[in-house]
């Protein structure tokens, strides 16, 4: 009798989704902390921007590096979303059924999955806008330019929604990855899961607080500094040329 061949495609797709999700989550963790450099000073945020433009490697600014990085992250984002969407409810009826089941069972992990679906849907639109801006306007990043974008270009509300959705999605995803990859196995799986869940909630709270503080600082600078002349922040300690 001929053995039925096992279809390995679903497993491979799941591995790609998990891997790309891990990469994006780690990127978000670093990105929010780098953005938070504005909380230290304008000069610190400027120096972080210079680092990503390659100044400390080449001795000159190359904003195109940021465009390349944004395009790379965007490609990973599209790949991740394209694979993940196959697990989304196919219709509103399916969504309603899952929601009712989650509320009836009061199963927190099912609720977390629903949060990921909703935040993932939000990110598909909001995240795409942010990535497009970073790809097309890499030179407009800095204490004054970024703050002007938040206030003068009315991007503040969008960044607020993006912060909440991306942080929630990322850390819930990391929790579910830890569960899937066996990091919670041990003598007492229930205790391990509770500890990982507590860590997830603490990290979500931490990153949202840091992100909101940064957004508030950018908003303050955008309100108090007139960027209508388009003059970027000038470092007090560095003389930088742009290419």
Task: Identify the residue ranges that each predicted region occupies.
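Membrane-embedded alpha-helical bundles that constitute the cytochrome b-like, heme-associated redox core
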Residues: 1-243
């Amino acid at each position: 009798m001929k053995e039925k061949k096992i279809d390995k495609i679903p497993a491979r797709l799941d591995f790609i989704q998990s891997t790309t999700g891990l990469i994006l989550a780690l990127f978000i963790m670093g990105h929010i902390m780098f953005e938070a450099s504005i909380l230290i000073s304008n000069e610190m945020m400027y120096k972080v921007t210079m680092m990503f433009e390659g100044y400390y490697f080449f001795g000159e600014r190359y904003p195109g590096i940021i465009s390349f990085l944004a395009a790379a992250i965007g490609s990973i984002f599209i790949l991740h979303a394209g694979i993940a969407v196959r697990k989304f409810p196919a219709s509103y009826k399916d969504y309603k059924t899952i929601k009712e089941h989650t509320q009836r069972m009061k199963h927190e992990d099912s609720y977390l999955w629903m949060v990921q679906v909703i935040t993932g849907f939000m990110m598909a639109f909001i995240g795409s806008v942010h990535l497009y801006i970073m790809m097309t306007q890499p030179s407009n990043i800095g204490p004054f330019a970024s703050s002007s974008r938040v206030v003068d270009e009315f991007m503040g509300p969008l960044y607020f929604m993006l912060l909440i959705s991306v942080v929630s999605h990322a850390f819930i995803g990391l929790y579910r990855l830890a569960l899937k990859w066996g990091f919670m196995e041990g003598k007492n799986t229930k205790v391990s899961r509770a500890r990982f869940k507590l860590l997830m909630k603490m990290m979500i709270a931490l990153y949202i607080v840091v992100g909101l503080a940064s957004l508030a600082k950018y908003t303050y600078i955008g309100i108090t500094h007139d960027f209508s002349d388009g003059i970027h922040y000038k470092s007090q300690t560095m003389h930088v040329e742009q290419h």
